[in-house]
Amino acid sequence: MERQLEAYCAHLRNERQVSGHTLLAYRRDLEKVIEFCNNQGIAGWDALQVQQLRQLVARQHHHGQSSRSLARLLSAVRGLYRYLNREGLCQHDPANGLAPPKGERRLPKTLDTDRALQLLDGGVDDDFIARRDQAILELFYSSGLRLSELAGLDLEHLDLTGGLVQVLGKGGKSRVLPVGRKACEALQEWFRLRGIAAPRDGAVFITRQGNRLSTRAIQMRVKTFGERELGQHLHPHMLRHSFASHLLESSQDLRAVQEMLGHADISTTQIYTHLDFQHLAAVYDSAHPRAKRSKGNES
């Protein structure tokens, strides 16, 4: 089983050209299946049956594995069996028709508008790191980029005169997004100092040494800003969630938010309507005369 897993991973890496992160996640999931098979005395991939795979999924769920993680595990198994069937090494797929247990969908964490403005209006020193980090925060909140999209930006992708940025999203799909005035100003200030360090390098966000800033480094800079300005944990996706939530709250245009986020399915975007409803419910509870309860009626 291990040998066939190695062959499949090589196929994903060399022919499918999946990202290193995805490859590592799939390998870990499939190694769990191999461990389960070894413990159950299942001799190979061709011997694994749907009842046994269902047992593994149930066991993982019982031990706290999320529905999302189990869906990824089943996706990894299906991908492996497609490969094995194509190579003539197997003739079935035990994951076919098998779904993970349904779990509660967690609402994304966001900053409210006041906290977002507190983060961005905290004041900026006129130096390389401060100007770069401010531009990163402004662009995340202005345009709702994913971490990988922002890290992969090149200078040619930005049109500050027109207030536009072109990003390459999931599945290699390109989209053009508006960039707000404050973000454009922050980027212009950053470019004033950036050009001194790497005038010929194409990456938008770079280190002092002129190298492209990694996704990990961007995560750490955002975390540092959150702790310093807000006293809380902050990550890039929280800024993306805040962008989506605040835009939907103001515009009520779900389709437009879907396009800007680069979601293939509008159901993914609809989770932000639940956040908007939470906000409306809080306003109602605090403001509507028939929603307020007197202290004497709280029993």
Swiss-Prot record:
Residues in Core-binding (CB) domain copies: 1-85
Keywords linked to the UniProt accession: Cell cycle, Cell division, Chromosome partition, Cytoplasm, DNA integration, DNA recombination, DNA-binding
Signal peptide from the UniProt entry: none
Domain Tyr recombinase: 106-285
UniProt-annotated location(s): Cytoplasm
InterPro entries: CB, DNA_brk_join_enz, Integrase-like_cat_sf, Integrase_catalytic, Integrase_recombinase_N, Integrase_SAM-like_N, Recomb_XerC, Tyrosine_recombinase_XerC/XerD
A GO biological-process term: cell division
Any one of the GO CC terms: cytoplasm
Subunit note: Forms a cyclic heterotetrameric complex composed of two molecules of XerC and two molecules of XerD.
Family: Belongs to the 'phage' integrase family. XerC subfamily.
Protein name from the UniProt record: Tyrosine recombinase XerC
Organism: Pseudomonas entomophila (strain L48)
Origin organism lineage: Bacteria, Pseudomonadati, Pseudomonadota, Gammaproteobacteria, Pseudomonadales
